[in-house]
């Protein structure tokens, strides 16, 4: 970068003159001179960019460019013409004459100079320029070319261990073998010599007339090194003028299981949550995409948004009818399964170490919270228990039914962009998620206790009566049932449920209160509530807490206990741990596309360190977020 000293003295008058052989009538140089003269009046003053611009115009490399420009302009204005366009022939004639002349040192030196290779090359270049012989002369076309004969093009490609990057098909009417598509990033696309629609005539000297596409593919597969194609070029080559788009896969796709894919080998498999770069959307049914995790490879075929949504819809309607399917999530269980799933339906939170094993009665626990040095909101037994039962609430079901049904056949791709939080922006909401007993609540507690001035939970809402030692806005926001239900119907409640006849929940406004204070809001959610949180105003970063293997879970939870409606201090059983692992797999299978980060809770200390690191990256490093979040922010400004 060119820098200048603002305190420097103005340049001398002689320095303002450009050191070039510039013609005064030259427009560009004259303008630059005038600019330098004007800038010299402001040089050294506190004017942004003046010194930098002056130094730029006065730099040696720009002066050298101006010299070259002036020389070219001078040559152009003189309109010089060569003395002869046949200087090389004239040189040969001079050499022949010198041979007949009596020998002398001068004549011998002249003869050696004219016969020197460099001088001959100089004269050859002179004659080429003088004769304007810049392109090779093609032989004239013969007069007896049949009008019906198509123009041919010979294409040679050197194939190493890389795929050719093209697919072929047979024309239904003519039976010709055509190039169906050119895969982005493949050998054929990089060469720029083959286009979709080109007709193959020969491959390595073998005519493809009458062959099936599979036979042509076999010829290509057996070829090594150089592959020679003889093709009839398409009259109007397709041009991909579309802008590249990045999407998050909201479903999974396996080309090997799709009978409709045009070329299985060219298919690109992906899983939920993968970020794809869509490089070609010219085909209405099959797009070309690549994973950003592997940008070096060529693109592959994926179903278009319309086609994949249609496949999802066909699969959805082909399933056996299940009444009230929209009310169920992967966490829901039938009444017959209730006794076998204590850890899921009846458990409050069974976390590591001694947190849950020292669980007090509800009244005593809340009173202890009042006497703490700092108060942590949102850790009430009733709040956690009602959240586990929220899917049984008729109110919850009536509001969420439509969204749940829609999400089952929702958009298979979600357009995303890179988002970098600016220092002036509010922090992103941190959402923790995981099966019961994995340690979500304890991780959140330790995170807030680690730095309560930086991390905070949102204060929940409740319809129960405030107790004598409680304060409105500290333990809970105490509201009427009518107010609570209005918040639900206006979609201002992120989560809610009912416990002992009272409603509990966390509102958007409660989260915003924490964010406006310049703190990071940390909350834990059930997976079925995640859609309501994914808004542009909160920009949540979802972290999934995953249990470790059975051996590690037995060791870390040997002293932990499960708190249920029916038992107190019930030890973890192997079936409880197995159910926790199974539940985590189901959550990851159904909701994994919403997870921004996954932490395996092998030990509470390591998991907490990983959580801190993940939160820091979420707030400070670029992340993929839905494009609607950014467009909504732009419209609101």
From Swiss-Prot:
ATP-binding as a keyword? no
Provide the primary localization.
cytoplasm
Q: Which residues form the PDZ domain?
A: 154-235
Q: List compositional bias (Basic and acidic residues) regions by residue number.
A: 1-17
Physiological role: May play a role in retinal photoreceptors development.
Instruction: Say which family it is in.
Output: Belongs to the MAGUK family.
Q: What is this protein called?
A: MAGUK p55 subfamily member 4
Show the taxonomic lineage: Eukaryota, Metazoa, Chordata, Craniata, Vertebrata
